[in-house]
Amino acid sequence: MSVSGYKSDDEYSVIADKGEIGFIDYQNDGSSGCYNPFDEGPVVVSVPFPFKKEKPQSVTVGETSFDSFTVKNTMDEPVDLWTKIYASNPEDSFTLSILKPPSKDSDLKERQCFYETFTLEDRMLEPGDTLTIWVSCKPKDIGLHTTVVTVDWGSDRVERVVFLLAEDKISSSLTSNRPYSRSRRAPKKDFAVDDYVKGSRPSKVVERSFRNRLPLYEIPKEIREMIENKEFPDDLNEGLTARNYANYYKTLLIMEELQLEEDMRAYDMENVSMKRRGIYLSLEVPGLAERRPSLVHGDFIFVRHAYDDGTDHAYQGFVHRVEADEVHMKFASEFHQRHTAGSVYNVRFTYNRINTRRLYQAVDAAEMLDPNFLFPSLHSGKRMIKTKPFVPISPALNAEQICSIEMVLGCKGAPPYVIHGPPGTGKTMTLVEAIVQLYTTQRNARVLVCAPSNSAADHILEKLLCLEGVRIKDNEIFRLNAATRSYEEIKPEIIRFCFFDELIFKCPPLKALTRYKLVVSTYMSASLLNAEGVNRGHFTHILLDEAGQASEPENMIAVSNLCLTETVVVLAGDPRQLGPVIYSRDAESLGLGKSYLERLFECDYYCEGDENYVTKLVKNYRCHPEILDLPSKLFYDGELVASKEDTDSVLASLNFLPNKEFPMVFYGIQGCDEREGNNPSWFNRIEISKVIETIKRLTANDCVQEEDIGVITPYRQQVMKIKEVLDRLDMTEVKVGSVEQFQGQEKQVIIISTVRSTIKHNEFDRAYCLGFLSNPRRFNVAITRAISLLVIIGNPHIICKDMNWNKLLWRCVDNNAYQGCGLPEQEEFVEEPFKQEGSSNGPQYPPEAEWNNSGELNNGGANENGEWSDGWNNNGGTKEKNEWSDGWNSNGGGTKKKDEWSDGWDNNGGTNGINQEGSSNAPQDPQEAEWNDSGEVKNGGTKEKDVRSDGWNNNGGKNEKEECCDGWKDGGSGEEIKNGGKFETRGDFVAKEEDEWSDGWK
């Protein structure tokens, strides 16, 4: 490595003449860790502060640390040495000395004799002699400290780069004793489960018969083989049309399901033992506490004796309890009897297919819809909505919001109406006002409101309940939950609007469901309404909030099963924020990564802003104007209008801000990104310490409370370790999570920890869109969550590689709002418009699905164990621990057999159940006794004779005689699809631009 040009002796003799060094990536520097004396010249220079376990040594802030290096003359003649601190970062943080620096116990005389400097001049070293030189560092701040020491003799030079990581008590407490080691697993043995012995289900996981049973939708063998061979039906070559809609999306869903199966195989275990735990057998599953894989009460796995010669059966084991990394299961009684302490097994984890089957059914049922719901461009004539004035319940509505509500009240069926706009423009509040107006002014209105996650659905319900000026009757509003949702996680003010039995959420019987005027649900849980038998057209209005976050099949669960032509469908969202989470690159590239909302904007009526189809909200009531300025210019053509009042009240009280007039601050930190154990997720202890310090300084002022603060960070390990420290400090009200967990939410103060601090890994992430820093949609969401103050903590030399982050960095610098390490050179980027089409939440994959010799990921977006490098495992797109869009896990491969849960709607509403160990004295639903008295449907799921059990039909679930054996028919014509076309290899797909990816997060 060379960091400086040659200088004359005269120049070196001037102590004050020091050079400059920019950011040096310690992982790319070969001179700092060790040296080979055989590669050196006649003067051999050792390395001070050598790396330990391939990382810089740690030192304590405020204390002097020192180490020596030696210079040996191997020549036959003396040499004249000039040794110098060429440069340090931070400046003047390192010194040189001939004497060993004094320690804390040194006497006064020893301290007085010690002399340190930046340059040791004109030292004559005789042949064979060795000179010992001491390097000292006294760090004032946490972070990486770097210096370059040069040793010159004659015209030759040796450079040594020193890296030290200055830490405080918080960062030191997070030091891991588990070095990172990627699990290099041998190829798994073939593990067939076609023939298995059923296990013992938990007592509360019982079958529930529904009027409309969910078909199995087992993947046809020929379709599976086609896709695995990179072949596909002609429909995919043709593109999405009204004729091939169901077949097109079912093929994409098969691709996605096959990818999930493949990902789950990484979790399979071989040659493992189980322990007796009373009536259970327990299996230790590494990573289970971090939901890798995710298993809950009622799920099942398959095991087979490791040394089975093929004559024994596989055994199914149901999960009865999950404790940390240990899962307690029950198998068939014969398996428990045969088990011994020395028994060794191979284990296969299973992918719960319920959600995927719901998606298959939804796109099948979409063929029953009025075509104008799916393809408004085919609409024969332009519609005109007749509007009537209304009296707003909320006094804060602006003109655009009032206009959009009038349109919703005046709509008469297809096509859908869209309310879209940037963050903080009041989309959800507009929906809430529309719901209340329908409730109070239209006597026969029945409204279904769906959101992508439980927290988002709860948020809507809370808004409805606290709206002043109107009271919704308790018996006219209902919150539908999946049975797997934890009872304990729901707020008391919401639980009274839910239906449950023994702390298990259930879907009420049909008679009860149809009495409600307002039903709030997630997209996935809305499938229970169709299962219970709610007719098409029962709901006069179906409102989809945050519609851009869901895939089109998810949106179709509510729309395709419950709409008639006159049903009013309203979508609210922002296609420039986060979209659906997709794991199959092939499926994403062909359209599964595009939301229903985004696809509608391909129609002229929507993209041209026709007020009879769409309203755009542009007034932001959330953020300080200075916070809005950059995202408005980058993503919304400068149309955002800052409309928040009282923007400076918090800023005025924070004395530590470098610029009180500017609501942002960037703390430049050079830390080390690390991993531990077999977990591929990154964390940065130095940034964690700075996050905690910032939270303490904020809460020291009464104007900012813990609940006012949110911390956004892209890596699961960073989230967990920040929470660990906050728990220790009893500061549990601070919310910490990923960007996905904050979409649709806001906090007075947002702190962003970017984590990455090495160019080597960041460049790899950027190349394949795996990381947080290369994702414009994530960037957009992250920086628009803050109401009053945005704090960014990160390495400026890393984030400046991305155009959007670079602009944010220099905006802070230009407004005197930057503090911390030295800045990089300002980079110039070619301006590119934000691309709305082709969004994706899966990363761009490298070409080969393997790891190279250096231990770097070569493919898949997913790291070992099927997990993305951010640590958020790829099991269904979870947003929080209990934030599955319907409460379901999506954890693996494998399928259920036809004789098992044949209706598909197991455990009282399509769930596998939850861990029931919870509060036994929790408040009971006041309506529970009423539901029990009215009874539940016990036998409503009988199939018609002409309905196939596999579900592969093309007409909403009713098989017709002319349908081909696999259910794949050509747009309803009854003709079999010809197996044409070839999948291009992954390397042949045209890679999307970085700003098209809406998620890089696993």
Curated annotation (Swiss-Prot):
Annotated motif DEAG box, positions: 545-548
Biased composition (Polar residues): 913-924
Keywords: ATP-binding, Cytoplasm, Helicase, Hydrolase, Nucleotide-binding, RNA-mediated gene silencing
Compartments where found: Cytoplasm
EC code(s) of this entry: 3.6.4.13
Top EC group: hydrolase
CC annotations in GO: cytoplasm
GO BP term, example: regulatory ncRNA-mediated post-transcriptional gene silencing
Bias type Acidic residues, positions: 993-1002
Superkingdom in the source lineage: Eukaryota
Residues annotated for ATP binding in this entry: 421-428
Gene null: resulting phenotype: Delayed loss of transgene silencing (post-transcriptional gene silencing (PTGS)), with full silencing in the cotyledons and in the hypocotyl, contrasting with a loss of silencing in true leaves. Impaired maintenance of tobacco rattle virus (TRV)-mediated silencing. Reduced methylation of cytosine residues in targets loci but enrichment of histone-H3 'Lys-4' methylation (H3K4me3) at the same sites.
Region spans: GW-rich, involved in binding to AGO proteins: 871-1001
Pfam families cross-referenced by the UniProt entry: AAA_11, AAA_12, MOV-10_beta-barrel
Sample GO molecular function, one term: ATP hydrolysis activity
Catalytic activity: ATP + H2O = ADP + phosphate + H(+)
Biased composition annotated in UniProt, kind: Basic and acidic residues: 958-969, 975-992
Region span, Disordered: 831-1002
Major subcellular site: cytoplasm
Consequence recorded when altering residue 427 to A: Loss of helicase activity
Record's function text: Probable RNA helicase required for post-transcriptional gene silencing (PTGS), a process that provides protection in plants against virus infection and can suppress expression of transgenes. Plays a central role in RNA interference (RNAi) process, a process that mediates mRNA destruction of translational repression. Required for the assembly of the RISC complex, a complex required for target RNA destruction or repression. May be required in the RISC assembly to unwind miRNAs, in the production of single-stranded miRNA from the double-stranded miRNA, a key step in RISC formation.
Family, per entry: Belongs to the DNA2/NAM7 helicase family. SDE3 subfamily.
Name this protein carries in UniProt: Probable RNA helicase SDE3
Organism per entry: Arabidopsis thaliana
Gene field: SDE3
